[in-house]
């Protein structure tokens, strides 16, 4: 058997998330159908993480196992010839059998795009930004700093997934200009993320940026470990899985895989 690693970009607008669901269109489902057409057998695809309905990806990583008789297949070209226009393979490579797209990951990066203008809105950006209006950048920056480090993120986890621990480490949280003058991108890098954790953090930060909560609210919520006390979840459409880091482990992964491959393909990370 051979293990193939994929780096995938997709527009999540018309998908019911990543994970396979009966009678619903998902990214995993489309990938498995395409691979099955090539191999003639059912193949299970394993992703680095589950994105929700409407969430996009520039650096989702997945792997699957196939018989060695398919060693000559050019997987990137073959899959892209079968996949619909809203999902594409940025890279495909043979990796060690020890590599696992989820369990080998050291850290992940997500971006969230905000629309800061109230007076007008570009309709074609509606599936990729949250129209939140003007924000106090100073308060926003202060709020982001409280997320850094190792914390119990129970207050920022939505229910629905069984996990062993709610403790995660945030390595970096920053902001920078987006695709247009009216957009701003929040980028967060962490050891891993709980269910809808990034969207919950963004929802809290926007509330702070609007002046409806103090930056110190983040610290208080982390200490409370109570999801019901935290602000509402940010909409799905602004979120993008930007990349997954596997380190120089010999398992077939390097830093920010999605970002690197997207740049090689001429795709800007802020798209």
UniProtKB/Swiss-Prot annotation:
Homodimer. Keywords: Isomerase, tRNA processing. Belongs to the tRNA pseudouridine synthase TruA family. Its EC number is 5.4.99.12. It holds the Pfam family PseudoU_synth_1. The keyword Phosphoprotein does not apply. The keyword Ribosomal protein does not apply. This is tRNA pseudouridine synthase A. Substrate binds at residue 110. CDD domains: PseudoU_synth_EcTruA. It catalyses: uridine(38/39/40) in tRNA = pseudouridine(38/39/40) in tRNA. Formation of pseudouridine at positions 38, 39 and 40 in the anticodon stem and loop of transfer RNAs. It is an enzyme of class 5 (isomerase). One of its GO terms (biological process) is tRNA pseudouridine synthesis. The lineage of its organism: Bacteria, Pseudomonadati, Thermodesulfobacteriota, Desulfovibrionia, Desulfovibrionales. SUPFAM superfamilies: Pseudouridine synthase. The active site is at 52 (nucleophile). InterPro entries: PsdUridine_synth_cat_dom_sf (IPR020103), PsdUridine_synth_TruA (IPR001406), PsdUridine_synth_TruA_a/b_dom (IPR020097), PsdUridine_synth_TruA_C (IPR020095), TruA/RsuA/RluB/E/F_N (IPR020094). One of its GO terms (molecular function) is RNA binding.
